[in-house]
Regions:
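Bacterial N-terminal signal peptides that target proteins for export
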Residues: 1-13
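C-terminal motif of bacterial Sec signal peptides marking the signal peptidase cleavage site
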Residues: 20-23
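Bacterial signal peptide processing site
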Residues: 25-28
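N-terminal segment of the mature soluble domain
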Residues: 36, 40-84
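Solvent-exposed, acidic/flexible segments
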Residues: 46, 50, 54, 100-104, ...
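Sec/Tat-exported extracytoplasmic proteins
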Residues: 61-65, 111, 115, 135, ...
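Surface-exposed short loop/turn segments
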Residues: 79-124, 128-146
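C-terminal/domain-edge helix-coil "capping" segments
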Residues: 139-190
Length: 190
C-alpha cells in the first residue's frame, strides 16, 4: 500500500484538532441533550395542541434516549397546552392587498414532578415566520404556508427541548429543596 507523503503530517494534525474540538465541549448544532435525570418523563399535550407538535417533541425526546411513559408511571410530566396560531398581514400593496404575512405559533409549557413540584414554571414559547404572498399564485402560497407551519412546529419542539436541557440531577434536587423550604415556611414549620 502506497500512502501519500503528506499523510503522516495530516493524520496527527487531524487527530489533534478532533481532540481539541471534543475537549472544549463542541457539539453539532441542534437540540442539546436532555438529562437522563428527567426520566421517566410523560409528555401531556392538551387537546388544542396539534399532533404534529406533540409528535415532534416526543420524537426528539426519544432520539435523545429519554424514557417516555404515561403520566401515571412517570416521575416528571411535561405539560404542553394553550396552543395559539396567528396569521396576520405584515405588509400591504398599494392596492391594499396583503403582500406579506407573518405566521406565529405560541404554546405554554411547564414541567412538574410526580408530587407537583414545578421544575419549569408555566412559560410561553413562540415561533414566527414571514413570507411573501402572491395573489396570482394562491395554490403555491397555500402549500408554502403549510410547509412553514410544519417548520414552526419543529422550531417550537426544539425550543421545548432547549428548556428541558438544563434540568440535570443537581438542579432538580435544588428545586425540590427550595419547594420543600417554601412549603415548610408556608405551614409555619422551622
Amino acid at each position: 500500500m502506497n500512502l501519500p507523503a503528506s499523510l503522516p503530517k495530516i493524520l496527527p494534525a487531524g487527530l489533534a484538532l478532533s481532540l481539541l474540538v471534543s475537549g472544549c465541549g463542541f457539539q453539532l448544532r441542534g437540540a442539546p441533550p436532555v438529562s437522563s435525570a428527567l426520566q421517566p418523563l410523560a409528555v401531556d399535550c392538551s387537546g388544542d395542541v396539534p399532533e404534529q407538535l406533540c409528535g415532534s417533541v416526543k420524537e426528539q425526546l426519544s432520539l435523545g434516549n429519554i424514557d417516555l411513559q404515561p403520566s401515571e408511571k412517570a416521575d416528571y410530566v411535561l405539560n404542553i397546552s394553550n396552543f395559539r396560531r396567528e396569521r396576520r398581514a405584515s405588509a400591504i400593496t398599494v392596492r391594499a392587498a396583503a403582500a406579506e404575512y407573518t405566521l406565529r405559533q405560541t404554546v405554554d409549557i411547564e414541567v412538574l414532578t410526580s408530587d407537583q413540584v414545578p421544575l419549569i414554571a408555566p412559560t410561553d414559547l413562540n415561533s414566527s415566520e414571514t413570507y411573501r404572498y402572491d395573489e396570482s399564485n394562491v395554490l403555491a402560497k397555500q402549500r408554502e404556508e403549510e410547509a412553514l407551519q410544519e417548520q414552526l412546529y419543529d422550531r417550537l419542539a426544539q425550543q421545548i427541548i432547549f428548556r428541558l436541557a438544563p434540568l440535570d440531577r443537581d438542579r432538580i434536587d435544588r428545586l425540590r429543596q427550595e419547594a420543600e423550604q417554601t412549603r415548610d415556611q408556608d405551614s409555619g414549620q422551622p
